[in-house]
Amino acid sequence: MNAAVVAMKTNTKPPYRLVADSIREKVLAGEYALGKLPSERALIRQFGISRATAAKVLATLESEGLVVRRRGAGAFVNPQSASPENAYVSTLIADMDVREFFSAICGSIADRARAYNLNLIWGARQEFNELSRDGSLDDYVARCKAANIKGVFFVPQDAMGERGVELRNQEIAETLRRKGITVVLIDRDIVPFPRRSDFDFVGIDNVQAGYVQAKHLIACGCRRLVYVSHEKQVWTVDARFNGMRNALEECGLPTDGPLLFRGDPTDESFVRAVMRRRPDGLVFIHDDMAIAFMGVCSRLYRRTVKYIGLDDISHSRHLGISSLRQPARFIGEEAARLMALRLGHDTLPPRQVLFSAELIPRRSSLGG
């Protein structure tokens, strides 16, 4: 049975999106070369969809610049959208060695890249370290050019409060683009929230994530929430904290006084400062922060407090930590798709693709 047909029986995506995804993947993989696409009638037979849905599929692909439709002749692959043969792409990721989330994303990119005739060259952590310390961008670009790298998946350094870091992230992305290397941002932008850069960006809806974290704790009986993050003023923190505030305001809960705490989770003085607010619910930037903070908190205080993290790392499952699971596989697949589109001379405005994170409730918020 056709994979898209199977997906329609099990997926919540609209049927036209599932069929469009299937056709798009084949176009980018070169299966249609520069030839004619299936007609509306052929799509109806192949996927068991209505005529209106088939028309919407072709209209969607046309709006993306992948196909052109000729009156009386049908739909054809846009010559500018054909994926380049055996193009090379690479990664430039600040946190590759410290978060399993990015490892999962890169694995997904590698799997999907092959379907788009893209060859992935893994970027070394050392490369980002050199660039983040004002290493020569010219040298990095020269290495990319020598390796025939046409595109880079870029996760910027996560410290937007530091002006030097913010400017360096922007300089890296803009220099690569100026030198003819396509950039797709993953997880975070190169400008402070709520601003958006003019690069394609794939990640989760961080405002929604903070909202879901807070709403879950409120549903579990919490009324005094605070947000706990590390010392760096990162793009994702500001977005998620906004989401938490939205949830508090929606539920008529107090938002006065300090609600956002940044610090070292292993520092007793920081933990005490947070707990002096007498919170009954803690929202953490990610699970690692929750594990470190609660380890210190449990030594200092006998009272219990409910909490939730984000990322759903392997330790969280064993420790019973409620979390939000980011769809790493889909983020990687979408990043690869956007890269293939851009390398195929796609000229649509910059895209921001945001996924929802899945709530995984466990003992830390549910009790027991």
What are the functions of these language-model segments?
Residues 190-191, 196-227, 266-271, 326-345:
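Hydrophobic alpha-helical segments within soluble ligand-binding/sensing domains
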Residues 38, 73-80:
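Minor-groove-contacting beta-hairpin "wing" of winged helix-turn-helix DNA-binding domains
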Residues 36-69:
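N-terminal helix-turn-helix
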Residues 26, 198-199, 271-368:
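Flexible loop/turn connectors
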Residues 211-253, 347, 351-366:
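An alpha-beta-alpha
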Residues 2-7, 11, 21-25, 32, ...:
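Alpha-helical recognition/docking segments in bacterial nutrient-uptake
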